[in-house]
């Protein structure tokens, strides 16, 4: 294969990798955790990734403890966990 062909192939593979959404193998493990309001009762609207529905959903976070599957915005949740 010529060097031009190899460069084209490399470019196409790089583009494909960049455009491929987050897959479950690349998703952080904490994205699989259930929503956890924690023991406090302040009541912050937050988002968590639901692996069964494959999307980010809103829940009420109590303000302390909980787990890492807890995002301030839906966009942050989607960019971290959504496929």
From Swiss-Prot:
Q: Does the keyword Disulfide bond apply?
A: yes
Alphabetically ordered keywords of this record: Disulfide bond, Protease inhibitor, Secreted, Serine protease inhibitor, Signal, Toxin
What is known about the tissue distribution of this protein? Answer: Expressed by the venom gland.
Q: Which parts of the sequence are marked as the site Reactive bond for trypsin?
A: 41-42
Under Gene Ontology molecular function, one entry of this record is:
serine-type endopeptidase inhibitor activity
According to the entry, every stretch annotated as the BPTI/Kunitz inhibitor domain falls at 31-81
- Which SMART domains does this UniProt record tie to the protein? KU
- Kindly name one Pfam family recorded for this protein: Kunitz_BPTI
Q: List the disulfide bonds.
A: 31-81, 40-64, 56-77
Question: What family does the Swiss-Prot or TrEMBL record give for this protein?
Answer: Belongs to the venom Kunitz-type family.
The protein here is known as: Kunitz-type serine protease inhibitor mulgin-3
Q: Which organism is it from?
A: Pseudechis australis (Mulga snake)
Task: Read off the lineage from the record.
Answer: Eukaryota, Metazoa, Chordata, Craniata, Vertebrata
């Amino acid at each position: 294969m010529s060097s031009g062909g190899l460069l084209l192939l490399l470019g196409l593979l790089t583009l494909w990798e960049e455009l491929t959404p987050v897959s479950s193998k690349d998703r952080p493990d904490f994205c699989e955790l259930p929503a956890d309001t924690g023991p406090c009762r302040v009541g912050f609207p937050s988002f968590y990734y639901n692996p069964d529905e494959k999307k980010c959903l809103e829940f009420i976070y109590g303000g302390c403890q909980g787990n890492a599957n807890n995002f301030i915005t839906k966009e942050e949740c989607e960019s971290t966990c959504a496929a």
